[in-house]
């Protein structure tokens, strides 16, 4: 420690070094981005393919399977799922965390190219991919409303103008629009009028397509001039299409308006969107992978004036939902907790030292260490988030520890009559190794966490590095700045001054004397203390097994997502009514601020809702409590269910589910899967540990199955392709022509009039023109009957899959839910052909359970190795680590007391305790070893004196750590559910360990000393016997 004497003799250099650390930290702080949590986004790529009119089974076998075979060969794919519905397939690829998404995207494109020859030739476009997780909640939702413009026109503005501009902004990954579709000219045909005129639907289609043509025409020129040729070959509005002649009947022209209603409408009339019960278009913005939420939202907010200016004055563009306010509020709460923690720690130091000068010395270590850490955070690419700021809050109790130990030892020498400069040199020489051991062993706790793969390792890497850097800076400050300031600020006092025996110090002295008397008794009854230590180890095991567990604390982000699931045969009109009813019920809750939702598209029995709650200061209930009371009201709506779940910052997997947790059934036999899924789902629904149980298996959709009489068709001169074309023209909203405009392209959509789509009897009015040109009714050669058919087909890997989703009732933990599911699956006797496994967050939870004990054990072994190297001993590290069982018991009991489940955040608290509580033992053992090796004291006298002399710094460091964590326990604002488990664990562990380790550590020290003496005497006896 002679090196550090240089800093005592060179105060200017020491001060400038300290200032440099602080200035670098200030600069780093200004450059740090802000986010709710560290970047832990799994690389997810969504591949989409379409084949209009194809059934879900056709899409699954002809499109999804070839794509899955090609995509499944890509390296680093951790999960591959697909959903095939009417005319569309989506394949979701989730990659390992260490996979670069850009490299993965190149592999995905290559796989799509390789599968192209295996896909149906009728696909109008190649499959496309997006680097975005479709299951992620939008970071911002905008709404467009107007009293003058139609929904289709609003959608056009959103798609043509807003979407393009927003997509170009930094951080934006995907912009999706819901609530309607692009404008279109819709041709609603009257099949009876067509039959009377002898005109087929296909003839109408061809006439429209031939009347609207865009193709190169060329130019004419002479020696002086050139003219381009332009014609009126394009029709752009409904009024232009209506007078179109499509047929001549006995010389009389039959116009389109004679057999159809032509109007300007939308491409897909089966879409609806609403914002607070008012028709609206929803613009849902998702961030790009690894993009910062706050930066992305700020970019969009800054562009809002420009976006509004680009729209007509009659259109209102509003922000319906924004993720950033609760993030900012949560970070403000953490910053407030940090300031309170710093103040409390300094107060603790002042109470013990009773001197402004003496208090200022360790107090300087706190801001310098914390501020200097910001520089390292910036260099490591970290952000200011809940976890990194929690690390700094906890660090306030640690960074002062080393300075306290150095200051207390120097003060003891000054009170003994030594001059301040000499006391500083002697004091730092005596405890330099102690503070080095304390700091290095604390940092060593995080080495296994830094090496840990997967989500927990990535999630808490910033926490571990941030805290470790703060501790190492504090170590540097305590060995440089602290002794230098002690040599110049502390006054030489020949003996303890009278004021130190007053007030708080009198209480402390009485406690120390009482501790000395009780310690003598304990050392004389060491056997009982050892039994107590063994009892705490056993209690640790029992508490860990029995305590409720979860993966990550459920956050209250002020936002809810709702998923509507209605009867599979419901019509679009009825589904729109359900959406309105649900929005009315949700809006009536006093904690709800606004509600937005949409329905329609390829699956008319589903819908989505986005709910913003009032700020936490304006409501007296949590998001989960809002869901619980709404669940009762929503259950009264017949024929449909609305499943609500709070939006979380961590979303695992890419599966779009109606609830927060999933259990997936897999089978190579689709019929077996469809047989067992309802039974399993029904059994899950009866479990009290689960709520909102639902499934993505949609195999009960209403379908009208037509059976062709092929012999009759052959006699009548009718082909199957002609009949299929008839049905597609009549009921498929077929896009038959394209209208080209400067900013976009629009479609001409043809189908029969709505009056003929309301009932199955309309099929009797359909006819086909045979090879002789005669109209033949469909009923002449076809029969039909209603059957059940799937609305979607799901795969995971290459197996048929069905995912059962569920939420947790209020007060239920995830470990109880997963255990109940496993018991139920065992009792049902599910055949081996059907396999079950947890997915998403539930799967990550189960995987983390198997690694938690290994992580704790690895941390203990790492600390043991570091201490063994520092002390050159196998035994003394065990003495120091004997403090851990009591801390574990205190932490687990505190979690039980507060009703908090054991989560990843609590696990980090346990690991922190491994580093914290051993500090007390290090201070005792280090002093005892020095005294014992000097030969002046026996082992018992050495450890007894060490306990008494180190009582004050032990109390100071423990209370500093305790008060540093206390604001996390008492916090109640935004993000409190994330911070409290860490604070509860640390405070509980510190309180219990402080009570027990003051007695168990000296007993264990003497126990190992006696064992060592016995081993030494054994060889001596062997020699004498020989």
From Swiss-Prot:
It comes from Pectobacterium carotovorum subsp. carotovorum (strain PC1). It is a multi-pass membrane protein. The chain crosses the membrane at residues 12-32, 333-353, 360-380, 387-407, 431-451, 463-483, 528-548, 853-873, 875-895, 897-917, 953-973, 984-1004. Its main location: membrane. GO terms for cellular component: plasma membrane. Part of a tripartite efflux system composed of MdtA, MdtB and MdtC. MdtC forms a heteromultimer with MdtB. InterPro entries: AcrB_DN_DC_subdom, Acrflvin-R, Multidrug-R_MdtC. This is Multidrug resistance protein MdtC. It comes from the Bacteria. The gene is mdtC. Belongs to the resistance-nodulation-cell division (RND) (TC 2.A.6) family. MdtC subfamily. It is found in: Cell inner membrane. GO terms for molecular function: xenobiotic transmembrane transporter activity. Keywords: Cell inner membrane, Cell membrane, Membrane, Transmembrane, Transmembrane helix, Transport. The keyword Ribonucleoprotein does not apply.
